[in-house]
């Protein structure tokens, strides 16, 4: 027995040294994921009110309302409470997955120390950002850091993508986990230990929705968490997805408001009507236009210096040009 316990400790130590296991950072609220000039919005301020328990969360809100940051902050909160170990972000297309990789790259180090950030789809090898992530960071001794080696190993096969800390993929990589294919248990293992975030849920067809329901049921069986994001969901589709976690509720109760957050646990259900919460807006400010004339319609040195000084003071500066050549 002592031998077995010692080997368990050795195994944990080896996993940490290899980069497969990364230390999580303490949850610091959704504001930690936002730029300094932004304040949490109406949807984002509800993160701390969401249950700290495994479950299915369906977030319906307009485009641009901050659903991505809300989902990532909630996943961070669950990871901090030992309810998950990693994050998987599944999107409908390769283009949206590539764009999400850039956003996750900016936030990965806020959730974990030396995280493995993996992109998985059929053309991930052509993504320049992902290639730079895989080859990043050498120590002063000229040896690759463990997390870089681990990232390269995980990226060798899409089936291993979910074994890291943060995975960004197309939705098919997740759906394969419930199909009768070789080594699907590897995907299932990675998904089960993660908070699965599925974006643009309304974009999937009937067949894909059937597979997605199977994925959600598998997550419920292992006590995992899922976050579904959509601008809007048809009532029938939303009810079928929510019912995968076992607790059935009145369909009208889940569709009586918009924007809306539905949370479904194994033995509990909660809903958060965003209309009942005041929208968090930045302080009002006034704008006073000041016309400045230039012979060639280009900013002179004095104007450029004013723009730089304003930016250094925290202002958001935008220069709009009439010609493409000038803008470039």
Kindly label every feature range from the protein language model.
Residues 248-327:
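Conserved interdomain linker/interface between the two RecA-like ATPase lobes of SF2 helicase motors
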Residues 86-107, 117-128, 233-237, 324-325:
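Conserved Walker A/P-loop ATP-binding site and its immediately adjacent core
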Residues 68-83, 103, 215-218:
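Walker A/P-loop NTP-binding motif
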Residues 26-60:
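Conserved pre-motif I regulatory segment
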Residues 53-75, 204, 230:
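Walker A/P-loop
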Residues 104-165, 171-175:
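A substrate-engagement module of RecA-like helicase motors
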Residues 186-195, 202-273:
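Post-DEXD/H (motif II) to motif III coupling segment of the RecA-like Helicase ATP-binding lobe
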Residues 1-33:
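N-terminal accessory nucleic-acid engagement/regulatory domains that precede
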